[in-house]
Amino acid sequence: MNLFSSLTLVTLILLTMPIAAINFNTHKFTNYPLYVKTTISCAFITSMIPTMMFIHTGQEMIISNWHWLTIQTLKLSLSFKMDFFSMMFVPVALFVTWSIMEFSMWYMHSDPNINQFFKYLLLFLITMLILVTANNLFQLFIGWEGVGIMSFLLIGWWYGRTDANTAALQAILYNRIGDIGFILAMAWFLINLNTWDLQQIFMLNPNDSNLPLMGLILAATGKSAQFGLHPWLPSAMEGPTPVSALLHSSTMVVAGIFLLIRFYPLTENNKFGQSIMLCLGAMTTLFTAMCALTQNDIKKIIAFSTSSQLGLMMVTIGINQPHLAFLHICTHAFFKAMLFMCSGSIIHSLNDEQDIRKMGGLFKAMPFTTTALIIGSLALTGMPFLTGFYSKDLIIESANTSYTNAWALLMTLVATSFTAIYSTRIIFFALLGQPRFPTLININENNPFLINSIKRLLIGSLFAGFIISNNIPPMTIPQMTMPHYLKMTALTVTILGFILALEISNTTHYLKFNYPSNTFKFSNLLGYYPTIMHRLTPYMNLTMSQKSASSLLDLIWLETILPKTISLAQMKMSTTITSQKGLIKLYFLSFLITILISTTLLNFHE
């Protein structure tokens, strides 16, 4: 077991070496990206040893090696939790990052700041592994904020573009709302349980855990782009494609789901929390799948697809299957990162063209990318015996056979059929038909960095699901029994989606509409959500503020403060100084009496 803990720490320490190396050398590294990529591949191979040991022995471990600080009875120490979740996720994250780093060497080769880009990606990976292996909430929060800030820096990588800056700001603001929930949960655990260690929280297992659970769900909603806080994920596609492939498909966006999986001992007996997660996940998966149907930007379609899969993971936790949600996280990382890399390959070859309407006929020009894209799409739709099938099919079966909300189940099934539609749409528009791009474009996909990186993820998309599902404890699981039609539901829904996709594409080809339908507008404009939240709400707030400010200015400054105050002050002053009281009748009467007396006296004197 000493070897187990040592090798795990070696994996984490290996990754910090390139960060330290670039600080020691004042001259510029010319081959720094290659150095980083090699380090990550070594870390991946090293991480496989403790993972294999864990699979073989099935023993969890907590490494606590540095006491941090003590606040009265709260003890904080640097501790790593090596359990099923972290031991399976670390190799997957390292493998995917290794491939994406190699892909970046091709994609970003002309960028003058490529060394800084690789340093950012490496820092992101380190913070992600801190998040995954953390044993207390404080350490988890460091990783949580770390991936957030690296996401901000990487989305805004091309800082000369307004869209990139806006998207980066949007990501950080939406995540900030989620962080409020996380801090609320941390405060609650500190006040009520006086601990931040995960196993102590689970042992104490508070009964009234609704408030911290709501905080954790809010945190997951922000980080994993669930409905309500979802617009930042499609906007994040303004960053470079390697960033989208690494952060916004396979690692960072699943951090919110991972947090809820970590806290499954609290959620498994909390029906209220489960219902919220189920409904939130079902709404997310349907809404984002619907938005993906009519997008024309290839990266936006894959981004909405990611958001839809995150909704599916949330549904899985909602039906009390956290381990299954985790399996889907691991399998999803392979083919989704590969889909982004294929889209990056196409975009790069077509001179940064992202509109699928301006592609077409690429199956002959880019055979390798085409193969990978089609296999990735099939894995995403849950094609039998590809990677996605092993988790997605199980999720649909579990949802079908569980005692759950029928509406949520129906929404999930419809969203699953939509997956087939938008996957077919990408293939149909980008790869088939006649070329719709300028003939002068020089298409070349024969770079070893590109081929090798996609090839590795392609093999992962074919076999990773089988390998992971056969090697994760528990090895012996009770076989689910169900009718044939129920077993075939997932496949039937997917096939129906394919047929529907072909019908829709034929309709749009041969039946041209003068005006787009309302449904199309709703889907294409993302359910009007960004328009309402980013335009209408601030506009109303600003106009109301302006009106209230101007009316208050008119009322208070221009009327009450100046004219009325001056007149009031003068009245006060005059009444204070003068002895006159304004009794006109009395004055006239006294005047009259005086005149009468004086005239009488005058007459009498004469």
Curated annotation (Swiss-Prot):
GO terms, molecular function: NADH dehydrogenase (ubiquinone) activity
Membrane topology, record value: Multi-pass membrane protein
Keyword annotations: Electron transport, Membrane, Mitochondrion, Mitochondrion inner membrane, NAD, Respiratory chain, Translocase, Transmembrane, Transmembrane helix, Transport, Ubiquinone
Catalytic activity as recorded in UniProt: a ubiquinone + NADH + 5 H(+)(in) = a ubiquinol + NAD(+) + 4 H(+)(out)
Transmembrane segments: 4-24, 43-63, 84-104, 114-134, 140-160, 171-191, 213-233, 241-261, 272-292, 301-320, 325-347, 366-386, 413-433, 457-477, 485-505, 582-602
Superkingdom of origin organism: Eukaryota
Major localization listed first in the record, in broad terms: mitochondrion
Compartments in which it is found: Mitochondrion inner membrane
One annotated GO biological process: mitochondrial respiratory chain complex I assembly
GO cellular component terms listed in the entry, alphabetical order: mitochondrial inner membrane; respiratory chain complex I
Record-listed E.C. numbers: 7.1.1.2
Family of the protein in this entry: Belongs to the complex I subunit 5 family.
Role description: Core subunit of the mitochondrial membrane respiratory chain NADH dehydrogenase (Complex I) which catalyzes electron transfer from NADH through the respiratory chain, using ubiquinone as an electron acceptor. Essential for the catalytic activity and assembly of complex I.
Binding partners and assembly: Core subunit of respiratory chain NADH dehydrogenase (Complex I) which is composed of 45 different subunits.
Record protein name field: NADH-ubiquinone oxidoreductase chain 5
Species name: Ovis aries
Annotated gene: MT-ND5
